[in-house]
Amino acid sequence: FQSSGSPIKPRINLDRPSTSTPTPPEAPTSPSARQPVTQVPQANSVPAGAVASQAEVKKPADPQPPATPSAPVLRRPVRTAMPASPPRMVINLDDIPDRSKPVWPAPPPRAKGQGGGKGGKGGKGGKGGKGGKGDREQPAVVRRAKPRRTASTAEGPAAESKESGGREAQIWVTPKGGKGRDKWKKGKEEVDKSEALLLKARKKTRLERKERREEVREANAAKKEEIIEVGPQGMTVSEIAGKLAITPANVVTVLFKKGIMSAPSQTIAYDLVKIVCDEYKVEVLEVEEEDGIASMEDRFVLDEEAEALVSRPPVVTIMGHVDHGKTSLLDYIRKSNVVAGEASGITQAIGAYHVEFASPTDGTPTFISFIDTPGHEAFTAMRARGATVTDITIIVVAADDGVRPQTKEAIAHCKAAGVPMVVAINKIDKDGADPERVMNELAQAGLVPEEWGGEVPTVKISAKKGLGIKELLEMILLTAEVADLKANPAAPAEGTVIEAYLDRTRGPVATVLVQNGTLRAGDVVVTNATWGRVRAIMDEKGAMLEAAPPSLPVQVLGLDDVPAAGDKFEVYASEKEARDKVDEFERTKKEKNWASLASRDLVRLDNNADGKGLEVMNVILKTDVSGSCEAIRAALDTLPQTKIELRLILASPGDITVSDVNLAASTGSIILGFNVDTFSAAEALIKNLGIKCMTFDVIYDLVDQMKAVMEGKLGDEQIPEKAGEAEVKAVFAARNGKKAAGCLVVAGRLVAPAFIEVLRKKKILFSGQLFQLRRMKDNVSEVGTDTECGVTLDDFDDWQEGDRIVCYSTVTRQRALEATPA
């Protein structure tokens, strides 16, 4: 018993009736105090104010003031009888809310005029002041409610507490009608509305999380690189897959189709990497090992003492698509006419020039070194080399042509090398020029102009009329000033070989760019596989120099062999050190060549897997410079070689000599010369031995002629060609008991003998030879259009009116390197 304190919440046993000592009633402490009520139909009654320990019947009493805690009324427990049938109850015990946070607030205390809300069990309710009036016995519907976060503000029925599994359970009693029912509905509607808002917020949160996950996934997704550099040690299959944004399984599949087995962790050589990258249209550059000479790039300027560094002129490379005006721009700056001396008006080698002019700002003498690169697609490696040795790149775009494939490639080279770019929109004086369209295409290619809020400066120029050239030079000097270019002229010279060739009188000649230090006559120079003591230094005009400071391109004589374009050079203290360095490079190169040869043999084995083999054409290539040799080899690789294979026996710069002719005679090779001369003794030997020798000065002509020679070795092929078509107009009996078709030629001509097809409703009924045609009563060999004739066949006579006869003739054609699309 408890006569004072907090209200008592009785336990309810819903399984069976029992008796217990009743507890005295309590007076509510406030109108909002919680007072659980259990309503169970019962025949007997107990005095008002008593509380039973289990489900019992309460008889409504006359309205009277509630009892006070000071004068409790104690009564004996009353044994109650259960009704004939247990009350119907709907209970859901899935979720049990916390006891300290009830879902529904307690109803106001029972008082006069409020008894209607708690009328007899199942009563009508709503009869204020006459609680218990409705004495109809109806089973109460007890529901277990799902907790609501916002339910604390809603009005509803009182909740009961029940021990369930050691936790408090909230039991809601659903009224059956009256004002209580209306309040319960109102509270439930508010809860449902709050729940709908909560679900909507949760759904929005889920969508936001999904969008964030997608953004992170896209940001982390691998992007295909446009240019891949491969060192002498090769790359693993997994590394190739990462750079191509594919799976290692894709790389393994490509190699498997070529007859090469591989694994994701396996390292493959440069040749196999190129096969995979060609499949996905990605360019591959072979880089030398980054120790020894190649590692000197890391020593440029960075290892020098700060007080020894001085400002140096900028090195500017001009790049862009073919015929967009790169060389014309350089002509105007140099005040020369280089284009007039180039074959077909296109640049086919790297040109390096040192230009002196008055500064556009203060008129002081200013120096800039320019490098002009080819725009033809065959000179990809030259453009890549130009991008790696430059400080600033000028991307020339024609205003009437826009961004072209080689323009995009040049942009990719500059981005890969991290070189700042200045865009020169050329030919603004021509009809059809549209600079705005060019800037839009540049933005799509990843270069947003400064005028549009980007970081790439653009200058509108006309290389022929000189419009905008002053502004372009100012932009170059401003960009160089921001870059703060410095070098140490007191250090031994280091730099890059821009171009090299073999001169018949002077020997190997190398065009080099000094990037740090000063190159002097008499220095011992090493360039990977070659070395030598510098005998002479000349500028682009042929003037002799005693020394070459940083950022100056010069020609060097004295090397023992022609170096490869792109090689790094360095000055050593003695010839012994130079020889040791070259020997070390040769050993490394041999190891790499063994791996390359093994890969090449696997590819050739795959080409001959059908047992038929390929016809091989041997070629000896002689070019003016090593860069041209590199470009022509790349161009010849683009020719289809599924039917005939090109094999380069020798590819080197220099004129055609007697030894070249003897090598061609012993190997059965064709000699190709590009911008070279032929020694007189070699010319006489070529005529005597009958060697095929062709020389060119334009790379387009060389590639086209080689394609024609390759197709000539394939021979002719017989191809069926449609000659005519006829329609069967009548069917009649022939003398030999067979049926003959009376036909009208509707297109072309019918020829005998020839191969024909008989079609009925586009379905082929017969394919075979037509040996005889009759015109009236005469045998003829040919019938033209709109002419009637008779046709009889030895193996077919199921003619019907409306049948079509298609006649084919055989045509002899030159076999092509690749199949002609249908």
Curated annotation (Swiss-Prot):
Transmembrane segments: none
Region annotated G5, chain positions: 462-464
Gene3D superfamilies according to UniProt: P-loop containing nucleotide triphosphate hydrolases, Translation factors, Translation initiation factor IF- 2, domain 3
The UniProt record lists the keyword Flavoprotein: no
Compositional bias segments (type: Gly residues): 113-131
Chain segments carrying region G3: 372-375
Residue sites binding GTP per the record: 320-327, 372-376, 426-429
Annotated S-S bridges: none
Protein name: Translation initiation factor IF-2, chloroplastic
Alphabetized UniProt keyword annotations: Chloroplast, GTP-binding, Initiation factor, Nucleotide-binding, Plastid, Protein biosynthesis
UniProt-recorded Gene Ontology molecular function terms: GTP binding; GTPase activity; translation initiation factor activity
GO CC annotations, alphabetized: chloroplast
Main location: plastid
Region (G2): 345-349
Stated role: One of the essential components for the initiation of protein synthesis. Protects formylmethionyl-tRNA from spontaneous hydrolysis and promotes its binding to the 30S ribosomal subunits. Also involved in the hydrolysis of GTP during the formation of the 70S ribosomal complex.
InterPro entries, sorted: EF-G-like_DII, IF2_II, IF2_N, P-loop_NTPase, Small_GTP-bd, T_Tr_GTP-bd_dom, TF_IF2_bacterial-like, TIF_IF2
Annotated spans, G1: 320-327
